[in-house]
Amino acid sequence: MTLQEMKKKVLGLIEELNPLSEYLTDDPDIQAKINEVTNQIMFELVRFKKMPKYVEIHVNEGDILEFADIEKECGYEIYQIDIICGVRYVPKASGTVLKFMETGTAEISCFVYPERITEKTKDKAYEFELSQDVLEVMPYGIAGDLLKSDVSTEYGAVYSNRYQEMLSRLDHRYQMPTMYIDGGVDV
């Protein structure tokens, strides 16, 4: 889904959509806030249903890697490391720094934030990297936040409540845990 499609969904929900307007709405407050509100909801959702990434980095014994080094390799802002295989390491600084105890290839699975939306972001070009179920929840969170300061109506609370309800039903897993055992002992 593109940013433009998301904006159309949100603005349609809150009855502020004007498809003839360059900004899809005539409301200047919504025009000014929609990108930042979209970021806030997107980042909230991605901490609930994490965005996994995988990267391989060649390391030498004694090398120290920080989040920034891993971010350069994978091209995303990391907020949590999941699993590291392939080489022995010792986590430092609450796991944000890794000291490698041997030479080899570090196979790093981590969780990242999506690309941030700015005023320069092209609505038609920006593609959300979130799962389909998250994209179905997201418009309600955006709508609720856009309307929460509008005290003349209850729309903000209606959309916020719907968002919380949908969020509580969202499954944070991408797959069910599985185990494969190879080999074994003949008795």
Task: Give the location of each predicted region.
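Glycine-enriched, solvent-exposed interface loops adjoining structured elements
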Residues: 1-187
